[in-house]
């Protein structure tokens, strides 16, 4: 496999080296190799343009969504990525901040109660989907004495649509289309829906409508006329069956 230059964006340099090494090991064990593997945080933020231009793969790391969002704004990452042609991979908070508007789901104690906590922030605009990762791990969690999803996130979903992703699922986008691979759910207008079941129901309804429309334009297939020999053979068969019944 071709070796690539990879560049990983981190917001807390205390963890940069640790997470970067773990990420590098995961890719290596999956058959990917990199010529260079560099991180970007506040220590080398001035080198951002050079690092991004050299990279072929950009990984948006995890962390605290609002904190990461501030860092991305500070280094004007949206503009840096807009003028480049890179493979971009987002993990956890990185995938969330990849949307046009990120839903910064309350995570730390006190955030859901803080009137100054901003739950919707302008982000990178890589995807249109608002992602909520790790759903299988956090769907039953409580925060500030309330159910994280049922009493906080569901309310915030009014007029919006959040796509939950279990670990192992991912969203793929090419600039035109976005496709979710794996089991996921949509939280919208305080309701939870299974994405696949919704897609299957919609597809079935669409196919039925197409069939009805086609019947209006497609002429029925005429029955094939029988030859004289076929008619005689058919008559003989019926007569034979009739005589057989009389004998019995």
Where are the predicted features?
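C-terminal and late-domain segments of enzyme folds
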Residues: 1-2, 8-10, 14-21, 104, ...
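Catalytic nucleophile loop
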Residues: 59, 82-101
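P-loop/Walker A phosphate-binding loop and immediately adjacent motor/lid segment at beta-alpha junctions
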Residues: 75-87, 158-161
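N-terminal beta1-alpha1 cap of cysteine-dependent amidohydrolase-like domains
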Residues: 1-57
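Short glycine-rich anion-binding loops that position phosphate/pyrophosphate groups of nucleotides
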Residues: 63-65, 93-94, 136
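Glycine/threonine-rich flexible loop motifs
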Residues: 65-74
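Short, well-ordered alpha-helix to beta-strand connector turns
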Residues: 55, 84-85, 127
């Amino acid at each position: 496999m071709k070796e690539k230059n990879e560049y990983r964006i981190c917001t807390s340099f205390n963890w940069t080296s640790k997470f970067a090494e773990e990420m590098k090991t995961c890719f290596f064990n999956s058959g990917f190799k990199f010529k260079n593997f560099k991180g970007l945080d506040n220590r080398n933020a001035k080198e951002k343009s050079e690092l991004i231009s050299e990279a072929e793969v950009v990984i948006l790391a995890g962390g605290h969504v609002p904190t990461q969002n501030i860092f991305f704004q500070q280094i004007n990452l949206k503009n840096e990525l807009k003028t480049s042609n890179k493979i971009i991979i987002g993990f956890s908070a990185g995938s969330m901040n990849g949307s046009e508007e990120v839903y910064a789901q309350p995570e730390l104690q006190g955030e859901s109660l803080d009137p100054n906590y901003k739950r919707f922030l302008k982000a990178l605009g890589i995807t249109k989907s608002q992602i909520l990762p790790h759903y299988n791990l956090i769907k039953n969690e409580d925060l500030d004495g309330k159910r994280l999803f049922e009493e906080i996130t569901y309310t915030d979903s009014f007029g919006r649509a959040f796509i939950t992703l279990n670990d192992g699922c991912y969203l793929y986008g090419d600039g035109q289309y976005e496709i979710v691979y794996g089991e996921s759910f949509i939280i919208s207008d305080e309701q939870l829906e299974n994405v696949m079941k919704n897609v299957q129901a919609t597809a079935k309804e669409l196919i039925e409508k197409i069939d009805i429309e086609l019947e209006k334009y497609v002429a029925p297939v005429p029955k094939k006329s029988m030859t004289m020999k076929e008619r005689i053979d058919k008559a003989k068969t019926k007569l034979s069956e009739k005589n057989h019944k009389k004998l019995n």
